[in-house]
Amino acid sequence: MGSEMCIRDRVAPGDTVKAGVVISNSEVGLGSVSVQPLIYRELDGNGIAVAGATTKRIHRGRVNSAEEHFMLASQEVLTEADRTFLTELQETVRSATDEEQFSQIVTLMQSAKHQAMNTADIPAVVHTAGRDFGITDTEQNGVLQRLIESDDLSLYGLANAVTRHSQDVESYDRATDLEGIGFNILSMPPRQWTRINQIAA
């Protein structure tokens, strides 16, 4: 594929984000590939995985053995099923980096930046949000630390603290989960954010 222009925008001065994707294969290795939009934050290298927007593609042709995965196939040895799969995968990646969808998410981030956190009891905000979104007590401690370090006491700051903490988690699968949880926090209904803040009052 030829080079394409990077899709990027600013959430705030000095805070640039750009469109990306997470591509993962199935655990059993049967030719299933998932493509999920990712918003990459240049400031700290965090990625927010857009939950609910994952697309799956399944390779309908022959599945290679583990040894064959280390071989680069030329166009001559690709089967018709291979070519179809690769074409569909390319289209899925393009769709995942759709500029309109990216702009909508940036607008969501900009809005969250202005949704202040109740600072009367910041640990209570983190604990309540963690309980709502399936973040463990140990992870909550890490999120709290990252939140305080960022000095961004807003809904946007909380979501970024979760994705920043994902970089400290040993399990890749759990880190990926936390990137998705970051988006779920970012996009929570306003009344849920209000309730979380009220509990911490």
Q: Across the structure, where does each feature detected by a protein language model lie?
A:
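Short, small-residue-biased leader/transition segments that mark boundaries at the very start
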Residues: G2-C6
